[in-house]
Amino acid sequence: TYLELAKELHGEQPVIEANPPPARRETIVVIDFGSQYSMLIARCIRECHVYCELISHDVPWEKIASLNPKGFILSGGPFSVYDPGAPLPLPYVYESHLPVLGICYGMQAIVRQLGGEVISGTKHEYGHAILHISGLECPLFAELPSSLPVWMSHG
């Protein structure tokens, strides 16, 4: 929250409840599509003092609802969205009207499901790169610089 951020900036450590009851806990749900980095994504979220759960892409809403989700992160994976039987996010991801962040395959799945086209790049993407962010007005990216070094692993 903004209050916790302000306290951190002024040297006061916010009180973080280690394991609040599920009814009060706000959860980011990381939906795993088979990425080798899914557990790393979840760990990084937790290191930011945000509770998250890593779940398989086929977990039904009935099991998700009890987690009190506040947003979804769709992981990467080894698939192409054009592969027959490629896993896609279940409808609740969109029907919930919660924020969704797609990473790699997760973003491709969003684009495909919402009627967009995913095309192959002209070269393999592996190694250090510079990410240029457009949309800094979005709260998710507001405190980031307009460009930053990243690691890519597509190929």
Task: Describe the residue ranges of each PLM region.
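Flexible inter-domain linker/hinge segments
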Residues: 1-25
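Short, solvent-exposed beta-strand edge segments and adjacent coil->beta transition regions
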Residues: 25-28, 128
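Conserved beta-strand elements of the Class I
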Residues: 27-31, 99
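The conserved SAM/SAH-binding core of class I Rossmann-like methyltransferase domains
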Residues: 31, 55, 103
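Two-component His->Asp phosphorelay active-site signatures
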Residues: 34
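Cysteine-nucleophile active-site neighborhood
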Residues: 39, 43-49, 66-143, 147-149
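A short, well-structured beta->alpha microelement
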Residues: 49-65
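Short, intrinsically disordered, charge-balanced linker/junction segments flanking boundaries
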Residues: 153-155
